């Protein structure tokens, strides 16, 4: 049954190089729905659900006047609408906030709610879809995935991951070229994002596709042991003097403690996640004290999620596709779902867009499977490389202005 009304879209959580491509897809899908007389106006919420509660809304049909603007948006990193990390409590705990949300939905005649985000954002989608249903307000709520962590269930991979993986693999490849100019023993440790899942760190192994890759790779999926690590490093140094170690920020000891915990303040975000960083520095100290060779650590930090200058064309195209698919799914009656990217079987890479019940996705984590990690727990298998490889293919043609990439700023 057709549902006529307005729509709203927001972005939440950590930005990526492709989250705006997904926003572009939602806008394109909404424009098509407008031509069909289904959607009247597409509002953009500034700073996610936080901005929505303040009625900080803009008419995106007015902001984006032509296809060129959308094309520029797709090549723009970070979240053009702004983001937030607000965690909605349950309706029972905070009835006032939910009543406010319903009031705003009715005020603007919003019948379609699209939320682009990662794991914690899907929790918001789940809560809103259930609340609307329990209060007899017809609202189609669709989660649109994005995360460089690639840790969302039900989808083969997430929009944003391919571009981040391409950046990580490229940066590791370039660092390897740099560290190999000297003959002295030296260890370079590259710390890569990934709290509970090591997908992004695993992608560093893609540097080996046309050259040398990292010598050692450590993921949160395997327990980290200091003695084994030192032994691994010593063995690699026997083969050549300069080695590179790729490590996830979230690796843990056998007792579950983060390796980098000693460098942390102990502070957590609104979702209860500890702030992580410093793992590379801890490993640097271990190498310095145990081996005594030259050692340095490099933290890729925010560059992993905002390097749109080296986006994966596959990732950008799929991100747009997922955004358009979200609108199509909603106008066809789906709600309480998250869009998925489904990979076709066979040697030739191909994907389609699907959707899955949000209840099985929110607050769950997809980790790197055992078959993608070598037996020693310090490298990526050929099966892992084959899974990752198609996701970084293709280059985005950028528009430059004054020698720098042009971005669309709302």
At which residue positions do the language-model features occur?
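Flexible, glycine/charged-enriched surface loops at secondary-structure junctions
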Residues: 36-45, 178-186, 243-245, 292-300, ...
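Short glycine/serine/threonine-rich phosphate/pyrophosphate-binding segments
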Residues: 16-26, 52-53, 89, 96-99, ...
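Glycine-rich oxoanion-binding loops at beta->alpha junctions
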Residues: 1, 55-111, 120, 159-161, ...
């Amino acid at each position: 049954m057709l549902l006529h009304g307005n729509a709203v879209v927001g972005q939440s959580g950590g930005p990526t190089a492709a989250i705006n491509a997904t926003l572009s897809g939602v806008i394109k899908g909404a424009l098509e729905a407008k031509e069909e007389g289904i959607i009247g106006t597409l509002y953009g919420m500034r700073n996610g659900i936080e901005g929505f509660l303040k009625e900080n809304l803009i008419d995106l049909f007015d902001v984006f006047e032509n296809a060129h603007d959308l094309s520029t948006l797709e090549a723009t990193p970070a979240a053009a609408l702004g983001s937030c990390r607000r965690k909605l409590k349950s309706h029972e705990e905070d009835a006032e906030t939910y009543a406010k949300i319903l009031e705003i939905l009715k005020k603007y005649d919003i019948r379609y709610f699209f939320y682009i985000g990662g794991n914690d954002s899907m929790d918001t989608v789940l809560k809103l879809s259930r609340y609307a249903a329990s209060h007899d307000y017809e609202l189609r709520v669709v989660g649109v995935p994005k995360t460089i962590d690639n840790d969302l269930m039900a989808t083969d991979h997430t929009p944003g991951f391919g571009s981040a993986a391409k950046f990580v693999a490229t940066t590791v490849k370039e660092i390897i070229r740099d560290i190999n100019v000297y003959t002295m023993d030296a260890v370079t440790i590259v710390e890569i994002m990934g709290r509970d899942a090591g997908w992004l760190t695993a992608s560093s192994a893609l540097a080996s596709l046309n050259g040398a890759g990292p010598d050692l790779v450590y993921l949160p999926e395997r327990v980290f042991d200091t003695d084994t690590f030192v032994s691994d490093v010593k063995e690699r140094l026997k083969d050549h003097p300069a080695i590179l170690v790729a490590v996830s920020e979230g690796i843990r000891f056998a007792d579950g403690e983060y390796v980098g915990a000693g460098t942390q303040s102990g502070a957590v975000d609104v979702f209860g996640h500890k702030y992580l960083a410093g793992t590379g520095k801890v490993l640097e100290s271990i190498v310095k004290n145990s081996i005594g060779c030259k050692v340095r650590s490099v933290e890729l930090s925010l560059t992993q999620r905002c390097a749109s200058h080296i986006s994966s064309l596959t990732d950008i195209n799929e991100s747009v596709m997922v955004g358009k698919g979200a609108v199509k799914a909603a106008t066809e009656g789906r709600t309480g779902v998250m869009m998925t990217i489904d990979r076709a079987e066979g040697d030739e890479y191909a994907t389609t867009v699907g959707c899955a019940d949000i209840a099985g996705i929110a607050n769950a984590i997809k980790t790197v499977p055992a078959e993608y990690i070598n037996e020693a727990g310090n490298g990526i298998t050929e099966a892992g490389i084959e899974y990752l490889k198609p996701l970084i293919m293709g280059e985005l043609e950028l528009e430059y202005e004054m020698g720098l990439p042009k971005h669309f700023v709302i």
